[in-house]
Amino acid sequence: MTTRQLPLFGARRTQRACFFDLRGGKDSAKFSAYTPKAVKFFSEKYSLAVVTKPEDLAAFDVVFFSLHCFRDFYRVARMAHHKRPGQQWIAGGNACTTPTAVAWIMDYIWIGDCRASFPLLIAGERDLQGLYDPRNERLIRYVDEDIDPEPLTASEMEVSKGCPRRCLFCIHPWRHHYQEAPQEKVEAFIRAQPGKGVGLMSNSSDDISYYDDIADVLTATGKTDMTVSNAVQGLTEQIVSQRKRELFLGVEGMSERLRWVVNKPIPRAVYRDKLDLCLSHGKQIRTVYQFNLPGEEMHDFDELEDDVRCFQKKYSKGSWAIPFIPNQPSAHTPFQWVVPRYSVEMSERLMEFRKSLFGSNKTGVAFYSPAALGPAKWFAQVISEWIAITPTVADAVERLPQKQDVQTMVDALDCMGVALPRAFLHRDKDTVFPWSNIITTGDDADKWKRFAGMQKKLASERFQSGAPVVEDREELRKRAGGTAAA
């Protein structure tokens, strides 16, 4: 009788992999910031299923998650019980530079850009520099890949990444070095689009060295950049007159002195000149501001409100949206040493301001200010960088008082058995953060030096007196093409 030797090792079983869409397929609008672009890009390129119902995950061996924002940490907590034994969960995305929130449930967490490495993850590679294993506390260097001109979607491509401006609160300059996609690739992408809208993604369109040429191509082809954002000082007559959709402006600080202290030095005179330019053309504008910035007082808002009332009287057409975002000290930026605070008094004043704009379209410029994020929801985002967001923690967060200051909410969590680290409210140069094992550099690695510089500004006579930031104006005038007011 003939006998056969059985193989010592059988063929490796193919692992079934999928993406899980935490938003249940609800966010799919073109050009929306909430559309899960990474899920769409990777699932289509590598033929991966996208699952929208957690009960359907049992059929898969590897589940990929794209965590877009801090709210996604809570979404994971609510569906974590669907993870079956032996199943691997792997998270990546913008929120994962602070992995503590999901390290309790994820087997691996990707830190940084993943275009080049994603096929390796699908193939089963797990010993990769950007892959954080919560069971191993080794240092992980944020993966900052070279910009890739391959379109993200059929109508969107990344034109630049990083930011040369280095605002102290913003994640972009501190995680990525500044890069631009090849101009010829961008122009070819625009010309190839069948529709009228294209998404040319960047932190600020004005920083792109060849954007004037791109604007001419858009005009010649009858197309519009649907995702444009402008630096206030970069607005010119040409840009404003050519813009068919809303002009998006990140002003950030309510007053000149606040903008100066966070390294976004837009003088009030320049700011008003640019708003004047936009409204004289009857354009739609959206100016984004932060509140709860270091050193902020009520008279900072007085300055902003005076500017709004001035233009309210001056113009009879156009629209102006004025959203306010509570500052959240972000990890891996100079602001990581800023102790978080939420001024309930300021939020109440913003609400009164919002109400005062109702019906403005009946007499002139249509002003609109959406309701700002309240203290409890803001606090939920802030603490998610610091502690594991388990179902128990998520339940406690839902029971937080709605209109209280930070200390009161910290105490409320403590009473529910959820303790925050002491460093949450007490930070210095030697603080070890939950994310200290993640190394980011961008174009400037010395974040503490930048924070210390801000502290000096806050203590300066200029900041205390609110004196104009005179020495910054010449540079701003150059950036604006010589149109800034002296």
Annotated model-derived regions:
Residues 26, 99-102, 165, 260-262, ...:
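Flexible glycine/acidic-rich beta-alpha junction loops that bind and position SAM and/or redox cofactors
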Residues 43-59, 187:
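A short, well-structured beta->alpha microelement
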Residues 19, 26, 62, 190-303, ...:
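Conserved SAM/AdoMet-binding glycine-rich loop
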Residues 52-138, 334-381, 396-401, 447:
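Glycine-rich beta-alpha loop elements in corrinoid/cobalamin-binding modules
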Residues 18-49, 73-79:
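Short, charged N-terminal beta->alpha structural module
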Residues 1-22, 44-50, 359-486:
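Radical SAM enzyme core and accessory elements
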Residues 1-17, 27, 31, 125-159, ...:
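N-terminal [4Fe-4S]-dependent radical SAM core
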Residues 25-33, 148-184:
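Canonical Radical SAM [4Fe-4S] cluster-binding loop centered on the CxxxCxxC motif
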